[in-house]
Amino acid sequence: MPPRFNDSWYYPDDIAHDLDGVEGLSEALKQEAYACAWEYTRCVIPQYTNWDRYVAFMRTIIIGIIAEFRGELVDVAASDSIMGCYSLSAVLDALFEGTPGRELMVREYKTFLLVTSEKTSKRRDSELFRRYVNGLAASPRSWFRMRDCDALARFSLAAALACNDMYDVFPTDEQFELLTEIGDTLYDAVAFYKHRSEGETNNTFAYVPADMRIQAFRVAREMLWALDVAYAHKPEGAILVNFIRFFGGPIHMMMRRYRFVEEDLTVGKPETAAVVAETRRNFKLWNRVDAQVAAPGQTSSDNSSDNRSSSISSTSSTGTDGSGAGDASSVHSSGVHSDATSIEPEKEDQSSVFEAPGADRFRSLLARSKELMFPELRAYLSRSGEPHCNRCLYRSSYGAQQIHRFGGVELCRGCRAMWRGYVESLPERVQEAFPDVVLKAPPPPSPRRAVPADGEADSAAGQRSKRLREDLTAAGEYTTVAETVPAEDVPRSAPDIMEDVLQAECAIDDMRSAVAVF
């Protein structure tokens, strides 16, 4: 077990009593939530000119933190009053009033609360959440838009501009898409094991092939620095890029919500059973999304879809990839083998026979989409009543079924390949959305040096030996240097060392490519 530390929590007095009177939360949890909101705000919006807006942003983070592990306390659809201590409209007005995009950001935040509280409450088997998770896997572009909202990414970017009194600058939708995709790719690559310990449905590499995680992080990081250079002299540049920079990795070391100290100053350790157990107890304010087991006596119509998915699970669980998600390529979502001649009757059966609990509530929420959902979400949910692919693994109720597994849809090989291509196209899409960005081609790999045959003189080593003797005698020191110096005793120049490093990296890339083939 990792060591436990008695943390002292620091946060400004402005938020120190926000949760007074809220039942169901201990005083220790309240203080940790205040400190977490302060630390996150300081990390992702390190500079500000408007303290009142800054405090309002902290309050949105406090509410969000509670929603992430005690969803039953936050019901944005029921009332403007959140937990009896916040007027949501007042908080959002304090943050965005008079700024461009205000109405869009209000809908963005309400969507986050609606879906997040659904995931962390007893309503996780609802029709809303089932369709939401189905929609996550529909396509890479819709995934990144939904993940953007789930991470409050564009919301925080807009808040960062507001907190710096920048009212004449607002990214386009396309620019928001790319900025948040870069940030979410970086964050999810680092948070891979954290999210897996939580049984998350929302991690990029639960859908993008996990063997791309390191390469995707590397490329996204390059795009971050390309944007940083392109917008270095624009006032909004540092504000927007700083959010991505800190959100994409450093917060895992600086915020106490993560396990950097508890895990020996490391980032990215695979989760253990002990970590999962702590997650269930909300240690570090984490939350475990376990698959829900059907209650005894449940009717066949209630669990018909679970029966279909369980047959797939038993078939596909024999093979898993690095993402912790099973490969569902050999079967349809109904458990029928992929060589079946017709899938249309099956799809009709899935949409007409099964409907999760809370269907009426889902329809009423959909009718309020202009109030409670970001603009694209209504369409995503409407077309997610049935599977988008008959070879991917869909379920009626989502959550991790065992340790080292994510909790969402498990994509088939064909869909994973399509997602791979989308992620690989990131640099081209960044250049289209941000014309000022100038992409650079990486330098060509150095040619491999031939290994001298036995008895063959190494001319480069001889030259280094000669240079060393000349340098030493010219300085008036070590004049008794022997006429020849063994090559292995001669200090190597920096260019020679770097050349060997590049060759080693090429060899490693070759080995990775070979492994990927198999």
Swiss-Prot record:
Family: Belongs to the alpha-ionylideneethane synthase family.
Keywords noted in UniProt: Lyase, Virulence
Name of the top EC class for this enzyme: lyase
Compositional bias segments (type: Low complexity): 299-339
Pathway: Hormone biosynthesis
Protein name, as recorded: Alpha-ionylideneethane synthase abl3
Residue ranges of the region described as Disordered: 294-355, 440-466
Role summary: Alpha-ionylideneethane synthase involved in the biosynthesis of abscisic acid (ABA), a phytohormone that acts antagonistically toward salicylic acid (SA), jasmonic acid (JA) and ethylene (ETH) signaling, to impede plant defense responses. During pathogen-host interaction, ABA plays a dual role in disease severity by increasing plant susceptibility and accelerating pathogenesis in the fungus itself.
Gene: ABA3
Entry EC no(s): 4.2.3.-
Domain of life where this protein originates: Eukaryota
GO molecular function: lyase activity
